[in-house]
């Protein structure tokens, strides 16, 4: 029989708030899918690894049998109400610290509400794109925008625990985005900033014209994001970079160029390129690999995927996160699946005699919470 290693304390180093509003079956189910869109006709997102994990872990906390029908679960959820459901599920995660990315739109709880509901400590992760948009709204000229942007980054650094960039390296307008190994020069930066501000103004005027206007947001220019990333790194806080579906190899030049600058890089949500992310973390002392979304998305296969990551990355370079957004169920599933999967992998090595139980417990603590406490200065 395979031994299991308990994973006690967790620091969720990247997550989002939960919705304050009630959800019907269709809207709840859509949030189980990666695209946050309805399932194809005749199918359901409950028939995914995430869906089965939700049905396994969540119903008992609401007083139901595990794997009960989704309709029964949603009915009980509505009966208890959003606040009580969130409280029960978040407190059952066993997460002691939530690092909350506050950049998502929607009626989501912030760090203070997350801390209250979960009985945890919560700190804010500042999304650079949102910071740029807020500054643009209050700056009348390009010069004023650039000055105010620099001040805003430094002000945010005084209270935030990290910065993050929401634009993946996967695609911008359908083309691969390369994260530049250097910031744009002053002249080029002014041109790029002016172009972005002009496009925002065009969109604002179009939206005011009503249904015929385009409306919508304007994606931050890639070179302006390069400037923002380097400005954020100068503050010394960790910088989280979302990989999306991109191969982390696209970040190799950036990782090499930023080594020795006093800022750690955390590669977020690398699955299905998790092995490449782990390898990059192994090559650079300031690069870390996040395990977020692997347990929830791979479900019963989570232990196998985690074992692949542990083959390549030093154990001190791996961080847990749920990556959860909108649904407290995803917070719970991320934590429960991670604990079970890591416990099984390490326990198997103990059973085989490859590791001692003491070493397995030490590594479990490192990955679950210790590494994050060190990287984000939570100790």
Model-derived features with residue positions:
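Conserved, mostly hydrophobic/aromatic
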Residues: 14, 98, 163, 232, ...
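Histidine/acidic residue-rich metal-binding segments in metalloenzymes
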Residues: 144-165, 172-287, 301-319, 337
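Short catalytic/ligand-binding loop motif for oxyanion handling, primarily in non-cytosolic enzymes
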Residues: 18-22, 106-110, 133-134, 170-175, ...
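Mid-to-C-terminal alpha-helical segments outside catalytic/metal-binding sites
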Residues: 1-13, 19-64, 71-77, 315-317, ...
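Alpha-helical scaffold segments that flank or form the walls of functional sites
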Residues: 26-118, 124, 147-158
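Active-site beta-loop-alpha junctions enriched in small/polar residues
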Residues: 16, 103, 127-133, 166-170, ...
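A gly/proline- and charged-residue-enriched helix-loop-helix capping module
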Residues: 126-147
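H/E-rich (His + Asp/Glu) clusters that bind or coordinate divalent metals
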Residues: 261-379
């Amino acid at each position: 029989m395979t031994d299991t290693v308990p994973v006690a304390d967790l620091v969720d180093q990247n997550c989002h708030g939960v919705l304050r509003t009630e959800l019907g079956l269709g809207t709840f189910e859509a949030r189980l899918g990666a695209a946050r869109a309805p399932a194809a006709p005749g199918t359901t997102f409950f028939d995914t690894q995430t869906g089965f994990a939700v049905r396994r872990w969540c119903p008992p906390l609401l007083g139901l049998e595990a794997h009960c029908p989704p309709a029964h679960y949603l009915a009980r959820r509505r009966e208890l109400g959003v606040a009580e459901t969130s409280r029960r599920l978040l407190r059952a995660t066993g997460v002691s610290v939530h690092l909350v990315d506050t950049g998502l739109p929607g009626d989501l709880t912030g760090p203070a509400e997350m801390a209250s509901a979960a009985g945890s400590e919560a700190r804010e992760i500042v999304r650079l794109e949102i910071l740029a948009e807020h500054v643009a709204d209050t700056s009348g000229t390009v010069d004023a925008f650039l000055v105010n942007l620099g001040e805003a980054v430094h002000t945010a650094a005084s209270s935030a625990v990290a910065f993050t960039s929401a634009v993946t390296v996967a695609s911008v307008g359908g083309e691969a985005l390369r994260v530049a190994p250097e910031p744009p020069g002053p002249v080029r930066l002014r041109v790029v900033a002016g172009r972005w501000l002009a496009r925002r103004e065009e969109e604002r005027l179009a939206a005011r014209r009503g249904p015929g206007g385009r409306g919508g947001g304007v994606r931050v220019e890639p070179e302006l994001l390069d400037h923002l990333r380097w400005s954020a790194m100068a503050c010394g806080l960790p910088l989280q970079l979302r990989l999306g579906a991109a191969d982390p190899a696209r970040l190799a030049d950036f990782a090499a160029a930023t080594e020795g600058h006093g800022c750690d890089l955390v590669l977020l949500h690398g699955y299905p390129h998790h092995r490449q992310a782990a390898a990059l973390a192994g090559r650079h002392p300031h690069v870390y690999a996040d395990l977020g979304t692997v347990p929830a998305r791979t479900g019963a296969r989570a232990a196998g995927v985690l074992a692949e990551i542990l083959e390549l990355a030093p154990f001190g370079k791996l961080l847990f996160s749920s990556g959860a957004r909108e649904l407290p169920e995803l917070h719970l599933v991320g934590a429960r699946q991670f604990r079970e999967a890591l416990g099984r992998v390490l326990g198997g090595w103990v059973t085989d005699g490859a590791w001692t139980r003491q070493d397995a417990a030490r590594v479990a603590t490192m990955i679950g919470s210790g590494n994050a406490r060190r990287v984000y200065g939570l100790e």
